[in-house]
Structure formats: C-alpha cells, structure tokens
C-alpha cells in the first residue's frame, strides 16, 4: 500500500472514531492513538526517510493536512463533549430549594476568653495595668528572682518543661512581675494574664497548658489589709455582692505571709453541693505579701516598699463559674459544648 493511501486510510478511520466518541477519556485515547509520540500518523512521518526525493514533499504535505484535520476535529469534539459533561453535572447537582439549608456556624468568644476579659475589666476598673511577657522564659525570672533556688522541688523536670539548662516554658505568669519590678520603680499596680505550662498528665483537673492571671501591688505602707480589701472587692464584682470570702494560711516561696482565699460556693450559695464537695466553700486563689528577698532581687528596697501578690487559675475560675467538671472540655473545640456559653 502506498504511503498516500495509508494516510488517507488513517484519516478516514480516525474521523469515524472521533465522531463516535462520547466522553473525554475516549477522545484522549484517540488523540494518543493517532497523534501521540508512538501514534500511527507519527510513525508514518518517521518513515519518510525511505521515500524518494519526489515522494517526500507530496507525502509530507498530505501528512500535515491529515494532522490538521484530525487536530481540528479533536478540538471540536472535545469542546462538545466537555459542554455535554458540564450540563450533565449541573443536571445531577441541581439545588432543591425546597430542602432545608445548612445553618452557618457563627463564631464567638471561648468561655476562657470571656472569663479572662471579665477579670481584666474588673481589675482595670480598680486601677491595675495589664502587663505581658514571654512564654519561653529565662530560668532566672521564672525561679531565682522569685525566691525559688536551684534545689527547690518546683524546679524538677517532672514539673517544668526545660528548653535547656537556662530556659523554660514559664510555669506561672509571675516572671512578668519580676521583669516589671526590674524596669519600673514603685508604685506598681499590675496584672499579668497569659498561658503557662506544667509537665502534668492530662486528666479531668490537669492540663499541661492552662491560663493564669497574677497580680502585683508595690508601694509604701502596703499591708495585708490592702490585699484582703482588693481581693474581696474583686470577688464581689466577679460573683455578686452576696459572696463571702475567707483566708487560710498557706506557703508560697515568693510571699510571706502567704494565704489562700476561699469564696462561698456560687452554685449552692454556701449550702454544700458536689461542686464544693459539701463544704460550702471553694478555693479561688493564692496570695500573700511579697517576700522581701523578691523585692531585693528586683532592685526594690524592702525597708521602704512593701506589696502583695495574688494568682488565679483562669481555667479553674471558668470551671467553678459554670459548673464544669472536666478541664478537657475547654480544649476539645466541641461546638455542642461551646455553644452553651
């Protein structure tokens, strides 16, 4: 069979196959079969070297004409098939306007953020400034400046995430207080809210990451009475005028004397329930008068100035306020839970 006859035969067969193609996959198969690197038309073009000088231009011209015809037909059928596939897809995906729509979820503040904002608002109204500091903290500010020496059990790797020997993930927001005292002379009146980190196993009451808010007041002639008055006022603003408070002796290395403040259970109003374990009282915070050594470490003369400090676990405040019995619920992003707040 002459080369011209082969080309005409390829053209006729290809046009028949193109006309019968119904989908994109079939069209691609035809394109490869005739025009691909190993296609029938390409094979003929590669064999032109065996033709005589007189035949080459004739066969070359015919081969190019066949290629142009096939490419044009393939392009036309491709457009037609794609449009048909598009219309079929639209037909199958038509929206039934009688069906109920999907409700859009509207974001809002997490209960932790809500409680933090409420606490900050109360303290700002009492004249406190809000201070911030690094979460990756120097060992000195997290421990030594706060009267926690190198052999203190709180510095154990079981309780603290160490980056290296001199850097930790802060275990409290107290380092912010130390940094402020170094840079600012009294009077100082500040709170430092933020995330802290402890090497705790996750359970219903413990999390390796949680929120704290700590406060500090330094000035001349500050007494424990000032501490009590400040925290009692906060409790009334936070939980209502009927709340009662009491202070119990405790120990913290950075305050002396130290105490814990309890408030009447705001679930049962002091009558006793499962939240307060039948006692009618709930532990709210730790507090005390700033230890003289802490003042010295931060460049403040304890013979001239005194002060008090306090600290809340914000997660605990949220749990107590809303009667939540598992801290993990605050971090699981379950909208069924979060939509209640």
From Swiss-Prot:
<dbReference type="GO" id="GO:0006432">
    <property type="term" value="P:phenylalanyl-tRNA aminoacylation"/>
</dbReference>
<protein>
    <recommendedName>
        <fullName>Phenylalanine--tRNA ligase alpha subunit</fullName>
        <ecNumber>6.1.1.20</ecNumber>
    </recommendedName>
</protein>
<comment type="similarity">
    <text>Belongs to the class-II aminoacyl-tRNA synthetase family. Phe-tRNA synthetase alpha subunit type 1 subfamily.</text>
</comment>
<dbReference type="InterPro" id="IPR022911">
    <property type="entry name" value="Phe_tRNA_ligase_alpha1_bac"/>
</dbReference>
<dbReference type="GO" id="GO:0004826">
    <property type="term" value="F:phenylalanine-tRNA ligase activity"/>
</dbReference>
<dbReference type="Pfam" id="PF01409">
    <property type="entry name" value="tRNA-synt_2d"/>
</dbReference>
<dbReference type="InterPro" id="IPR006195">
    <property type="entry name" value="aa-tRNA-synth_II"/>
</dbReference>
<dbReference type="Pfam" id="PF02912">
    <property type="entry name" value="Phe_tRNA-synt_N"/>
</dbReference>
<keyword id="KW-0479">Metal-binding</keyword>
<dbReference type="GO" id="GO:0005737">
    <property type="term" value="C:cytoplasm"/>
</dbReference>
<keyword id="KW-0436">Ligase</keyword>
<dbReference type="InterPro" id="IPR010978">
    <property type="entry name" value="tRNA-bd_arm"/>
</dbReference>
<keyword id="KW-0460">Magnesium</keyword>
<dbReference type="GO" id="GO:0005524">
    <property type="term" value="F:ATP binding"/>
</dbReference>
<feature type="binding site">
    <location>
        <position position="256"/>
    </location>
    <ligand>
        <name>Mg(2+)</name>
    </ligand>
</feature>
<dbReference type="GO" id="GO:0140096">
    <property type="term" value="F:catalytic activity, acting on a protein"/>
</dbReference>
<keyword id="KW-0067">ATP-binding</keyword>
<dbReference type="InterPro" id="IPR004188">
    <property type="entry name" value="Phe-tRNA_ligase_II_N"/>
</dbReference>
<keyword id="KW-0030">Aminoacyl-tRNA synthetase</keyword>
<dbReference type="GO" id="GO:0000287">
    <property type="term" value="F:magnesium ion binding"/>
</dbReference>
<comment type="subunit">
    <text>Tetramer of two alpha and two beta subunits.</text>
</comment>
<keyword id="KW-0963">Cytoplasm</keyword>
<dbReference type="InterPro" id="IPR045864">
    <property type="entry name" value="aa-tRNA-synth_II/BPL/LPL"/>
</dbReference>
<keyword id="KW-0648">Protein biosynthesis</keyword>
<dbReference type="InterPro" id="IPR004529">
    <property type="entry name" value="Phe-tRNA-synth_IIc_asu"/>
</dbReference>
<dbReference type="GO" id="GO:0000049">
    <property type="term" value="F:tRNA binding"/>
</dbReference>
<keyword id="KW-0547">Nucleotide-binding</keyword>
<dbReference type="GO" id="GO:0016740">
    <property type="term" value="F:transferase activity"/>
</dbReference>
<dbReference type="InterPro" id="IPR002319">
    <property type="entry name" value="Phenylalanyl-tRNA_Synthase"/>
</dbReference>
